[in-house]
Structure formats: C-alpha cells, structure tokens
C-alpha cells in the first residue's frame, strides 16, 4: 500500500513538473564572468518564430539567494501567465547580500537589461518594450529598476554592453519593500531595524545606523518625472513586508504625477492569497496596455 501511495505521489509530481514552462535558453551569462549569479533563462511563447515583447522576472529571497531564477514558485506565479499572454520572459539571477552588498543587486539587474537590448534579435525579443516584475525582494529590485530608469549613477559597470540603455517601460511590484527606514513603524512580525534583518544585511549595517545607505537602497528615493508606469500589488495582512510600504510608495508616485495603481488584497499575506488568477490577469493586462 505504501508503495502505491508513493507511486501516485511521484506521478502527480511529474505531472506538475510537466505543466511548468520550460526555458528555450538556459543559464545565459549576461555579465561574461561565468558566475551562476549572473545568469538568466529566456522563455518564449509557443507562437512561432516572431519577436516578442519582454518582461523580466526577479525571484523573492530576502536578497539571500543567488540562483532561484528557475524555481517552480516563480514559474507558476509569474512566468506562466506572461507566456500564456504572448510575452517572452527573462528570469534572472542576481548577487545575494552575502555575495555583495547593495548596490550590486540593482547593478546586476541593469546589466541583464542591457544584455537583452544588445542581443534582442538573437533571442527573438522586441526590445521596444521591456517590462519588469518580481515579488518581495524581487519586487524591491523591480521597483528600483523602474525608479532609477535613466539614472546614470545607478548603472554600475557589470557586463560588456554599457553603451545600451537599462531603463524599463513598465513595472509590476508584488509586495516589495520601498522605504526601509519606516518598515518597523507600521507593523511587522520581524524587526527590520535589527542588524541581522534582510534589509540591514543588504546594505551592510543596521538600517537606522546607516540611513544614507538605506535611502540609497529605497526605490521611493528616486521617483521622478521619468519613472515608468507602476502596478503595485500587496496583501493588507502582510506581516513580513508591511502593507504601508506599498501605500506610501503609491502616495509618492501620485505626488510626482507618475501613472500608478495599487491593488490591495484584503486577505493577502506575504505571498499567501496574493497570486490569484484574477490578480495575475491584472498584471498581464497592465503590461499589455503599456506595450501598445
């Protein structure tokens, strides 16, 4: 009987794996250094040999992981809905906070975008539209890519395509931190001000003792009139990245007259009850509207 249950479990696991999207190109190094944290996978819709608008996806890991671009979680929650709607997807790795402190992570993201623009034809990509999305720490880096679009001081020097632009055309931020310095003011199950918090580890010191570094890592710092449209999605009972992070960010975007929308999910926690089909469809519609 135990063997029968095991075989059924194994078969179901294989069926689920078969349902997940498969990258057309895997482990492309966008920095030319053979490091796993500088690789990406590119997925194409099953729609022939035409070129496709692109969305980058960034996994959430509290900035602690450097090789989760192919996780089942990101495939199900972000990659599959985008592919189903005709978008190509580049799922990227980046340096973790143990590999290097900020701004290394956003430098990696921008290097990946420049690589895509430089090599779009080879990978059937229409680089006239590049969107970006991610959840949690991946939402933070997606938001950073958006608010620092056209900001030369945040480019870094990763890779060999520095002559290409790294701006993005639209951002979907799934519950990403946007202002580290106020995270403990609005409810959380962790102490973000602690020296061992993910945010403190990212900048290399306790955030309240390193306020300049914290502000430099905050997407909200860089909002300006060149900031692209934003769709922000956040659960209202998120106790890891408090809901106030997105609410405050939305207010700042409004003040700068940046096109934006906040979807607040009443029963949404940190990822739980957030990636609903209807919310994934909102993401897709947002990218479609901005890629026309």
Label each PLM-derived region with a short phrase:
Residues 18-50, 101:
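N-terminal cap/lid segment of alpha/beta-hydrolase-fold proteins
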Residues 33, 154, 182-222, 228:
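Mobile cap/lid helix-loop segments that gate and shape the active-site cleft of serine hydrolases
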Residues 51-62:
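Short beta-strand element of the alpha/beta-hydrolase
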Residues 69-90:
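Short amphipathic alpha-helix adjacent to the substrate-entry channel of hydrolases
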Residues 100-121:
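Alpha/beta-hydrolase active-site loop
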Residues 114-187:
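Primarily recognizes the serine-hydrolase "nucleophile elbow" in alpha/beta-hydrolase
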Residues 231-234, 238:
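Short beta-strand/loop motif that positions the catalytic acidic residue
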Residues 268-277:
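Catalytic histidine-centered segment of alpha/beta-hydrolase-like enzymes
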């Amino acid at each position: 009987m135990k063997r029968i249950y095991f075989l059924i479990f194994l078969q179901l696991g294989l069926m689920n794996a078969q349902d997940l999207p498969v990258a057309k190109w895997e482990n492309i190094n966008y920095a030319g250094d053979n490091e796993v944290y500088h690789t990406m996978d590119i997925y194409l819709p099953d729609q022939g040999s035409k070129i496709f608008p692109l969305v980058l996806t960034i996994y959430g890991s509290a900035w602690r992981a450097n090789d989760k671009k192919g996780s089942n979680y990101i495939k199900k929650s972000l990659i599959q809905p985008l592919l189903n709607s005709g978008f190509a997807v580049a799922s990227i790795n980046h340096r973790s906070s143990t590999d290097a402190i900020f701004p290394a992570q956003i430098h990696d993201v921008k290097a990946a975008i420049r690589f895509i623009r430089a090599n779009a034809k080879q990978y059937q990509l229409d680089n006239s539209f590049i969107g970006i999305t991610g959840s949690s720490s991946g939402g933070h880096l997606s938001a950073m890519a958006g608010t620092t679009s056209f900001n030369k001081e945040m480019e870094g020097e990763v890779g060999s395509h520095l002559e290409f632009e790294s701006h993005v055309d639209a951002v979907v931020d799934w519950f990403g931190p946007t202002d580290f310095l106020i995270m403990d003011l609005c409810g959380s199950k962790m102490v973000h001000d602690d020296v061992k918090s993910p945010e403190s580890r990212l900048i290399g010191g306790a955030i309240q003792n390193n306020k300049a570094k914290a502000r430099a890592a905050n997407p909200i710092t860089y909002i300006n009139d060149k900031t692209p449209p934003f769709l922000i999605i956040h659960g209202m009972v998120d106790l890891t990245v408090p809901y106030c992070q997105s609410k405050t960010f939305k207010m700042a975007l409004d003040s700068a007259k940046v096109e934006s929308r906040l979807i607040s999910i009443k029963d949404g926690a940190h990822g739980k009850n957030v990636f609903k089909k209807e919310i994934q469809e909102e993401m897709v519609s947002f990218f479609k509207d901005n890629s026309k």
